[in-house]
Swiss-Prot record:
Description of how the protein assembles with itself and partners: Homotetramer.
Positions that bind Mg(2+) 1: E92, D114, L116
Entry cofactors: Mg(2+)
Keyword Cytoplasm: yes
Cofactor note: Binds 2 magnesium ions per subunit.
Pathway(s) it belongs to: Carbohydrate biosynthesis; gluconeogenesis
Principal subcellular localisation of the protein: cytoplasm
Metal-binding is among the record's keywords: yes
Protein name: Fructose-1,6-bisphosphatase class 1
Originating gene: fbp
Gene Ontology molecular function, alphabetical: fructose 1,6-bisphosphate 1-phosphatase activity; magnesium ion binding
Organism: Halorhodospira halophila (strain DSM 244 / SL1) (Ectothiorhodospira halophila (strain DSM 244 / SL1))
């Protein structure tokens, strides 16, 4: 597939390489791209259409929702439930699964998404994004249950994100087909392939972590960051740079483009809240881990490969360390050493 091809043509070509593929998969990815285009327009207009600021509501995690959190969730529901390509939907912004109303046609797939990741940045005009994961729906199920969504990350058919920044970029990882980047050409409203078969450098001198939590970190994380901060004079023998955007989509996109490691590890503060991590497994950690692994990187909790975690709840949380493979493996080794 050549640079400059449209997302639609790429999907059609990719589907030919998938066993038991039908037009539903193409249709579903087209539905997602339509939703992302609409969200890109809302993000771009911001206060011009009254989209900035907080809504008078909280999501299931107890987090105050931004106006755009609510609106983008509605955009996804409208775009994804009209054409019969999915059987159900899970969103960060909804307590329970979204079941299609009768007599809607049910598709072969289930969608899990964070409609607007990093929304705390929206009021200050910092990049935000959409994250999505696609898994197969159980055969013969009229209305899927929450348990049907609880599949290992390795079972994802595809995953991706859309970054709303200076340009709008859709990154897609179809299982076994690598990672591709598509840039929205606003002149004619199409996502165009601009980078194909993206690979993350194995080594890096950049890390992204919220250092304000340093006093709460576990020893393996403390050791790793301490070594990085010692630079050339320390055991690593090289200087490192720190990055932190507080938007997972922006962090992962930077890593895909030039390498790095992103960390939101388990720490004492998170444990005190009775949580297993900060980021959501099913619609943040799993899809991003599939993307990173298909680009040659690694993704772990520090103790276990993320894609092999056994999920127990659609809003379950997990620690996340992902990015350049050699650094991720080093951090995992530090956890093993204790």
């Amino acid at each position: 597939m050549h640079i400059g091809t449209t997302l639609t043509n790429y999907i059609i070509e990719t589907q030919r390489n998938l066993p038991e593929a039908t037009g539903e998969f193409t249709g579903l990815l087209n539905d997602i791209s339509v939703a992302c285009k609409r969200i890109a327009d809302l993000v771009n207009k911001g206060d011009l259409v009254g989209m900035l600021g907080s809504a008078d509501s909280e999501n299931v995690q107890g987090e105050t929702q931004k106006k755009l959190d609510v609106v983008t969730n509605e955009v996804f529901i409208e775009a994804l439930t009209q054409n019969g390509h999915i059987a159900g939907l899970v969103s960060e912004e909804m307590d329970d699964i979204y079941t299609l109303p009768n007599p809607s046609q049910r598709g072969r797939y289930l969608l899990l998404c964070d409609p607007l990741d990093g929304s705390s940045n929206i009021d200050v005009n910092v990049s935000v994004g959409t994250i999505f994961s696609i898994v197969r729906a159980p055969q013969g199920s009229e209305n899927p249950s929450a348990g049907d969504f609880l599949q290992h990350g390795t079972e994802q058919v595809a995953a991706g994100y859309c970054l709303y920044g200076p340009s709008t970029i859709l990154v897609l990882a179809v299982k076994g087909q690598g990672v591709q980047m598509f840039t929205l050409n606003r002149d004619f409203g199409e996502f165009i392939l601009t980078r194909k078969d993206v690979q993350i450098p194995e080594d890096t001198q950049e890390f992204a972590i919220n250092v304000s939590n340093q006093r709460h970190w576990e020893e393996p994380v403390q050791r790793y960051i301490d070594e990085c901060l010692q630079g050339k004079e320390g055991p690593r023998g090289q200087d490192f740079n720190m990055r932190w955007v507080a938007s997972m989509v922006a962090e992962v996109h930077r890593i895909l483009c030039r390498g790095g490691v992103f960390m939101y590890p388990l720490d004492a503060k998170i444990k005190a809240k009775g949580q297993n991590g900060r980021l959501r497994l099913m619609y943040e950690a799993n899809p991003m881990s599939l993307i990173v692994e298909q680009a040659g990187g690694g993704a772990t909790t520090g103790r276990q490969r993320i894609l092999e975690l056994d999920p127990s709840d659609i809003h379950e949380r997990a620690p996340v360390v992902l990015g350049s493979r050699n650094e991720v493996e080093r951090i995992a080794r530090y956890h093993q050493e204790g």
